[in-house]
Amino acid sequence: MTYEIQASVREAQGTGASRRLRREGQIPGILYGEGQEPVAIAVDHKTVFYALEKESFHTALIKLSLNGETKDVIVRDFQMHPFRREVQHIDFQAVKADQPVRIRVPLHIVNAENSQAVKLQGGRVSLLNTTVEVVALPANIPAFLDLDCAEVVAGDILHLSDIKLPEGVESVSLKRNENLAVATVTGKKR
């Protein structure tokens, strides 16, 4: 899914200026990367808030329009208000289509309900890590990675090497020869 966000350069910076922006329905943010100086920006709160609720937004290639120019960006970080449903700040990183990006991608468990551990042994599959850090070209970044648990039995430990990565996507940990555990399979307590 493609996301498009309108942004404007913000001149005033600091706590007071950020509060005024938020009262006007805007979010202070920053755009950096691609060999450019960081640019202080403001984006519409409603657009970003509802987009952040979608898991795919966090790994999507976003078209950010700034001063009539469109840049390809990814969300690098964001801060939420401690108790209100309000985004406080967002960081965008500009990316180039031909340069790999390092990003954390969500991990999904699939076929666990069909596994011997769950069906026959009354067990469950528990994720130890909900995301996996990968390196890929911006166009190849997956929305999520699947961990197939169809063949697991109670007591199994699933590692990064058990994840089938799409073509053009590499695990950062596997490149360093670190085959980390990502999920465990437990049997029913007796």
Curated annotation (Swiss-Prot):
GO biological process entries: translation
HAMAP family, alphabetized: Ribosomal_bL25 (MF_01336), Ribosomal_bL25_CTC (MF_01334)
Gene3D superfamilies, per database record: Ribosomal protein L25, beta domain, Ribosomal Protein L25, Chain P
Statement: the UniProt record of this protein carries the keyword Ribonucleoprotein: yes
Protein name: Large ribosomal subunit protein bL25
SUPFAM superfamilies: Ribosomal protein L25-like (SSF50715)
Subunit structure: Part of the 50S ribosomal subunit; part of the 5S rRNA/L5/L18/L25 subcomplex. Contacts the 5S rRNA. Binds to the 5S rRNA independently of L5 and L18.
